[in-house]
Amino acid sequence: EVLEAIEGALRADKVELFLQPVVTLPQRKHVFYECLSRIPLGDGALLVPQRYLQLATERGLVSAIDNLLLFRLVQLVRAAQRDHLDIGFFCNISDATMRDVAFFQDFVGFLAANPSLKNSLIFEFSQAVIDSDDLETRINLQRLTQLGFRLSLDRVSHLDFDGADLAAQRFGFIKVNAHMLHEYADHNSVANLRGNLSRHGIDLIVEKIESEDMLADLRQLGITYGQGFLFGEPRAARIQNDR
């Protein structure tokens, strides 16, 4: 059923773009949006990446999904720029797409031909693919940053960051799960983490903030960017066609 849904969505151009806000704290002002993919099932339900990503990876379909999502996102960015909205969009690039040489070549070529996108798009990559220290990955990241695009580290599994190395690769953001940050330890440990990142010009965004109590604990740690259901659940993007 899942494979049929993926293939049907790709054939019908039906991969949907959802947005979740990233806010400043304590103001809760929307300053960024995380872009998320959803694949519709026949009964009106939606598949989230956790349900389809492994199968899509095995079948070599992830780049096609990323391609459709990027197309939707570009439409959205252009509409936001026409309306002079000062907002940024985080766009996740999957590990499989990073390894798809043909797709990534076309992807970089498209971005080079559309330089205005660099002001609004921030590309996210998993900590695992960055930690692999693969030469081809570093070259691909460099190609993006040479075009002026900002980068973000996502799907973080450990907090042993090399701030200098990430800054050298032009990472400007790191997203960390709120539960992981709570487990990390005390106020001083988090302050040291934030200090290490801020010295290298990297902003920390805490995601999966789900309650006011959780937020209160995080505010005591000096967190300035947040994301999670407390500030807004993912909602379908309303995209206007290019005029």
Go through the PLM ranges and name each one:
Residues 41-46, 70-74, 155, 228:
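Short acidic-capped amphipathic helix/loop micro-motif used as an active-site/signal-coupling element
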Residues 83, 114, 147, 199-200:
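Helix C-cap/helix->beta junction micro-motif
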Residues 14, 60-61:
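Catalytic-site/binding-pocket detector for metal-dependent nucleotidyl cyclases
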Residues 1, 86-93, 235-238:
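Flexible, glycine/charge-rich interdomain/linker segments that couple
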Residues 1-55, 232-235:
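Active-site core of bacterial EAL-family cyclic-dinucleotide phosphodiesterase domains
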Residues 25, 39, 95-97, 122-132, ...:
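EAL-family c-di-GMP phosphodiesterase catalytic domain
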Residues 75, 105-109, 136-146, 188-196, ...:
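Alpha-helical scaffolding segments of alpha/beta enzyme cores, especially the outer helices
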Residues 61-136, 208:
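Catalytic core of bacterial c-di-GMP phosphodiesterases, primarily the EAL and HD-GYP domains
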